[in-house]
């Protein structure tokens, strides 16, 4: 039996995606609020830095594991303000999360030029060489087969297309590392219980962060998927990192 991690638990590979879907379906309506509370608002600064990695907004952009649409809607607003002709596709395997993204897009009057697709990051329903940019923020660690998702990213990007990933990473500074670990395992699940009534969902999220590869390990995985010019930039002492790479 092919097993993988669901948090710290070992589960059958074929069951992980369903378990992850349940986590996000259960927290979808409070997802944005929880992001603010868990990160003390820092996730907004991280995402602002993330979208700065896309200099050309006259592009076809695929946002995978789009969730409630934060990245795509930031890009859509930036493009509208600059009168750029952007094409944005939001893809997520969880329909409940995409419903939140659609609602936000309508509320912000940003629905134009947006497409929504329910799809797995491991099996994207797009032809080869379709997009100029592939973005994924805080999503790739939830994919059952990360290597397969990276190869799919490489496939759907045009030649010299850019892969950009924002993900929780490994803190190296001792005092920050100790505080961060205590906060993650003790405070975040308690906030989840208080706000969402679901401590277990946030225990999983914390555990998935703990098990995610280090910056250098993930860099090698990206390179092995077929990318070139692979690099990363740490933010907030390595709490998160922005990984980037290009297709040949």
From Swiss-Prot:
Keyword Methyltransferase among UniProt keywords: yes
HAMAP family for the chain: MenG_UbiE_methyltr
Name of this protein: Ubiquinone/menaquinone biosynthesis C-methyltransferase UbiE
Gene3D superfamilies reported in the protein's UniProt record: Vaccinia Virus protein VP39 (3.40.50.150)
Root EC class: transferase
UniProt-listed PANTHER family: 2-METHOXY-6-POLYPRENYL-1,4-BENZOQUINOL METHYLASE, MITOCHONDRIAL (PTHR43591:SF24), METHYLTRANSFERASE (PTHR43591)
This enzyme's EC code(s): 2.1.1.163, 2.1.1.201
Signal peptide range in chain numbering: none
């Amino acid at each position: 039996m092919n097993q993988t991690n669901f948090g710290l638990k070992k589960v059958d590979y074929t069951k992980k995606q369903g378990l992850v879907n349940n986590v996000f379906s259960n927290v979808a309506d409070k997802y944005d609020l929880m992001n603010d509370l868990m990160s003390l608002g820092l996730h907004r600064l991280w995402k602002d830095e993330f979208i700065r990695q896309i200099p050309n907004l006259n592009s076809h952009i695929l946002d995978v594991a789009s969730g409630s649409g934060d990245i795509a809607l930031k890009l859509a607003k930036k493009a509208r303000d600059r009168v750029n002709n952007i094409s944005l596709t939001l893809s997520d395997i969880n329909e409940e999360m995409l419903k939140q993204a659609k609602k936000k897009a309508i509320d912000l009057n940003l629905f134009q030029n947006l497409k929504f697709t329910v799809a797995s990051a491991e099996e994207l329903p797009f032809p080869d060489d379709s997009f100029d940019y592939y973005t994924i923020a805080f999503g790739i660690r939830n994919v059952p087969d990360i290597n397969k998702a990276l190869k799919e990213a490489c496939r759907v990007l045009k030649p010299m297309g850019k892969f950009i990933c924002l993900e929780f990473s490994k803190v190296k500074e001792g005092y920050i590392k100790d505080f961060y670990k205590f906060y993650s395992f003790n405070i975040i699940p308690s906030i989840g219980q208080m706000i969402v009534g679901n401590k277990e969902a946030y225990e999983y999220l914390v555990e998935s962060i703990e098990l995610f590869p280090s910056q250098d390990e993930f860099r090698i995985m990206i390179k092995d998927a077929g990318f070139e010019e692979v690099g990363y930039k740490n933010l907030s002492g390595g709490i998160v990192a922005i990984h980037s790479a290009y297709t040949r």
